[in-house]
Amino acid sequence: MKNRKKEVIILAIVLIIQTIIYVICGINKSYIHMDEAYSLGLASYDKVEIQNNEDFYNTWHNKEYYEDYLSVQEDEKGQYNQVYENQKNDVHPPFYYLLLRFGMGFTQGHFSKWPGIVINIALNCSYLAMV
């Protein structure tokens, strides 16, 4: 019984330390990688890839053009059909993208790195709790 309690305490300490590290790294994160951009796009955009837009190449685009790709807009909150449609053309399972889309609904109209970071923290904690 004492060993089990000790294991739970150690696991809780590890989870707290990892969460603190995740948050510190998240605060210091100032850019996103291409795979992160694709994840955000697959979770929010109404087309599979932004480069399939007719005006994508040979045109200078402003910040709003890319924020539309990387964020859920006000009129899209609660709509998950984009995730389903995009995943029909992708090899990855849709559960992560559904979670990401849900999290992105809290930061409507602009890009935020936090929905993905919070999902990763939650998944990591749940994996460790299963151990």
Predicted regions located by residue number:
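Short, Lys/Arg-rich, polar N-terminal cytosolic tail immediately upstream
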Residues: 1-3
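Interfacial juxtamembrane loops and adjacent helix segments
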Residues: 44-92, 100, 104-114
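Transmembrane-helix motifs of polytopic, lipid-linked glycan transferases
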Residues: 109, 114-131
